[in-house]
Amino acid sequence: MHTTNYYNTFIEISDDCPVFESEIPKERGGNKTVALLQFEMIAHNPYQFTSDEVLFNIHALRKDLPPNEENKQEFFSKGQACFRASPLGKRYGWGIHFDENGKMALYNLDSPEYQNLKADPNLKHVKAMRNKKL
């Protein structure tokens, strides 16, 4: 089974992120976007979920599937995009921190916590994927 989990890692916003302060994703067409669902699940429950748990639970919700082990195995039988590809770091300006257990929390781009995590030499640092190819 493939995994998207990170440990002791900080995902910084992408180099071409279009915002200078973090934004909360909005609904589109009366429906919650993947970005909004990710934001709500992580921001309202910091350090409660791993990347795999967030991605699978949102997949199950959007596909109206029971979040059972069988569906989880099927979902992760194919590689899934990790949180570097999330619109939270690419478009909305949120840093994503993973602790030693792989549990994640969001940090506002203009917060002191974001700057502290960005400068922390004890963490692995990666950037969210760029929005456009060079």
Q: Where are each of the predicted segments found?
A:
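Long, contiguous N-terminal structural blocks used for assembly/anchoring
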Residues: M1-D52
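Surface-exposed polar/charged interaction patches
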Residues: I13-D16, L61, K78, D120
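Surface-exposed beta-strand edges and their flanking turn/coil or helix-capping segments
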Residues: E21, P25, F56, L109-S111, ...
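Amphipathic protein-protein interaction modules
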Residues: L55-Y114
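A recognition module on extended beta-rich or small alphabeta surfaces enriched in W/G with H and D/E
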Residues: A119-L134
